[in-house]
């Protein structure tokens, strides 16, 4: 029996190409529609030509500056925004059209604060009902009691907390607990740990890693907080201007930079900021503005080198392209393998 458990856990090691496909994004393009339900004339896509595939056991860290498109991508994956059915598949089904994914808990999205709409006012307020944490958590039906008890312990929840008196961090713990009660297969996290203290956050990340390694779940986690994340993700996705800039296993990212993960991402964002400043200057001077990062780069193969020597957001100082990475004709599409 013990040997069977070991084989089961190892079968969900992150990065295995033979693991089941959990998330597949193919040439995703998205623009928020106008009041007529159509994209405004002349509008540029907010998300454009975005493709990646995640397998069972993958833990993907989604990074990028404010406004890069991270939340929009997660909402599309969570079935909250409609795109063509074949653009986004969760376990082979359309994230938006197959409502059974979310109703069953197989696909779970956690992001933002608990809020409710104010009728006719056009805005929302945080949920602060006079109700206990126990009633909220135990009010979710169809839950494995052992899983519920483990989550209460991991998140250090006091069941006597009253939601109208609880702190932001305490309410956040209850929100996360309720979102994880059902055994998800794909979990989308949008800056969900922002209110948690260091201890609870560390215990939660450990629990989520176990979910991937033991049950074969896949997680995409967007955050700007890097405490405890140095070795947590299996893959890094860097997004800028709604486009995929980099998608690599964590070991490959570490090979490209000798800095910490946080400092590496900081370098990408600083270079992106500098590129944005240069574009604005060129535009103000009446010069042409480069549209994309890698399209005009003569550098091929290694994605890190493309980001380095091309006119690109996310340049890494630790990589330099050699003569073997150049080609006579321009390479417009770059395929990044796992």
Model regions and ranges:
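Hydrophobic anchor residue at the start of the ABC signature
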Residues: 176
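Helical segment within the ABC ATPase nucleotide-binding domain
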Residues: 201-215
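Conserved beta-strand
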Residues: 25-28, 37-58, 86
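The feature captures the beta-strand-to-loop junction immediately N-terminal to the Walker
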Residues: 63-65
